[in-house]
Amino acid sequence: MSDENNQPFFNIQRIYLKDMSLEQPNSPAIFLEQEMPSVEVEVDVKAERLADTVFEILVTGTVTAKVSDKVAFLIEAKQAGIFDIRNIPAEQIDPLVGIACPTILFPYLRSNIADAITRAGFPPIHLAEINFQALYEQRLAQIATQETGAGSAAHH
């Protein structure tokens, strides 16, 4: 085998909008409200191994806007990417799919959500940048806490 075949390889095969839904349960009355809506944003990352070196990474964004207790709109979008990752040490795969890949996908998700919100007749909402490194570390800490809790519960 040549050295070339053992070189670390990272390639984006495809980026696509996998799913999107928009609900406006209180339209058209909600458009007459004068109060500014409160906005809640949730982001989640999932990874699935499709083949030995191929992964689908999914970044899901959910935006809920409410005026008082009434939902103005709720939008959920799933931005996906297929990534070919080869000759990367096993311990580096998880951070790559949990940090680097979502960082690549997020601008597409943000753009699709902003576009859908304005097409729905609402003022644009631009999602802030997300620190996927911090999100990844937070997830690892949660897993460690759950495992510690499960381990101590088993000893009782």
Swiss-Prot record:
Cysteine pairings via disulfide bonds: none
Keywords from the UniProt entry: Chaperone, Cytoplasm, Protein transport, Translocation, Transport
Cellular component annotations (GO), alphabetically ordered: cytoplasm
Location relative to the cell: Cytoplasm
GO annotation terms (biological process): protein folding; protein tetramerization; protein transport
TM annotation in the entry: none
GO molecular-function terms, A-Z: unfolded protein binding
Signal peptide: none
Domain of life: Bacteria
Pfam family of the protein (one): SecB
HAMAP family in the cross-refs: SecB (MF_00821)
Subunit structure: Homotetramer, a dimer of dimers. One homotetramer interacts with 1 SecA dimer.
UniProt family annotation: Belongs to the SecB family.
Function according to Swiss-Prot or TrEMBL: One of the proteins required for the normal export of preproteins out of the cell cytoplasm. It is a molecular chaperone that binds to a subset of precursor proteins, maintaining them in a translocation-competent state. It also specifically binds to its receptor SecA.
Protein name according to UniProt: Protein-export protein SecB
